[in-house]
């Protein structure tokens, strides 16, 4: 059974989620979001949204246009699901909260370009719990309409642009930010502008009728994005599409905590994890407020809050 730990406020820290690892504010006006998609993507988005509306529990929400990496991750992990495109990360999370989707597939970090912006507050604010994580190998393609000529500008999500920045600099191509990779491909297909290309998955090029000019242009040989699968804490998992991969036996807990910017404050706060043999696999800092008097940290630890050793470590964190 997967843990369904909800957000638990405990003075200076929050337990956000506990989940097994996989082996590998009001109603949103989501219908108006259709205008944010390029013309080439609108028909596909409308079709996918209509199918998801007929069977919301089978729907898995994602940010972006059809053909983006989140869409691919859903196809890999939930082959029997109904992908539900949403224009923003907040929209995807809201779709789950409003019952328009049973789950959401959200990227949180990349091996080349680090964490995905805003996830450290969007996820805990959503109140959803992590069911699983999924690691997707990323293959960025330079795509453009036939006859685009010499490419001088490229459109894509900032994460994709960051993962390919050295390649783009070496080829004297200027980067332009877009809401997502597949959406960039759709816009390039609509514009048919000389010299303009997109960075996107090959699937997006196929969907929007673009040529693949280059493949595998990331700045590292291994480019992997970590996704998390989120759902409501009280979700009946038997009602949702099954996860393709078997779950491993390892439980992970993610948490946020805040410490004052004083000597040894962080050391004292996390000392309990080491003392109780709890492995911390991730620790990131975020500035807390405008006073710069405290820092917020995001951490992943092995185990679940109900385990004695994890509970003891959390008690020490709580005390500090």
Feature-to-residue mapping (PLM):
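Domain-level signature for soluble enzymes in the chorismate/prephenate branch of the shikimate pathway
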Residues: 6-320
């Amino acid at each position: 059974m997967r843990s369904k730990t909800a957000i638990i406020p405990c003075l200076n820290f929050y337990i956000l989620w506990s989940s097994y690892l996989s082996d590998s504010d009001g109603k949103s006006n989501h219908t108006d979001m259709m205008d944010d998609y390029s013309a080439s993507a609108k028909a596909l988005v409308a079709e996918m949204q209509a199918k998801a509306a007929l069977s919301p529990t089978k729907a898995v929400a994602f940010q972006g246009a059809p053909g983006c990496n989140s869409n691919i991750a859903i196809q890999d992990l939930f082959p029997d699901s109904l992908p539900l495109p949403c224009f923003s990360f907040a929209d995807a999370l809201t779709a789950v909260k409003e019952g328009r989707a049973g789950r959401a597939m959200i990227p949180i970090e990349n091996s080349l370009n680090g964490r995905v912006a805003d996830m450290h507050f969007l996820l805990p604010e959503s109140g959803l719990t992590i069911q699983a994580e999924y690691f997707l190998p990323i293959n960025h393609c330079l795509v453009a309409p036939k006859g685009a000529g010499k490419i001088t500008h490229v459109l894509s999500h900032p994460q994709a642009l960051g993962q390919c920045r050295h390649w783009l600099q070496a080829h004297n191509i200027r980067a332009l930010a877009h809401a997502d990779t597949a959406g960039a491909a759709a816009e390039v297909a609509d514009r048919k502008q000389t010299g303009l290309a997109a960075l996107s998955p090959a699937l997006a090029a196929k969907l929007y009728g673009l040529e693949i000019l280059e493949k595998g242009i990331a700045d590292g040989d291994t480019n992997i994005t970590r996704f998390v699968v989120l759902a409501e804490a009280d979700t009946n998992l038997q009602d949702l599409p099954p996860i393709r991969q078997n779950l491993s036996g390892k439980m992970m807990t993610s948490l946020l905590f805040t410490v004052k910017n004083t000597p040894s404050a962080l050391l004292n706060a996390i000392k309990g994890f080491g003392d109780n043999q709890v492995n911390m696999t991730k620790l990131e800092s975020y500035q807390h407020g405008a006073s710069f008097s405290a820092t917020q940290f995001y951490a992943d630890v092995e185990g679940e809050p109900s385990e004695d050793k994890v509970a003891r470590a959390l008690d020490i964190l709580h005390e500090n």
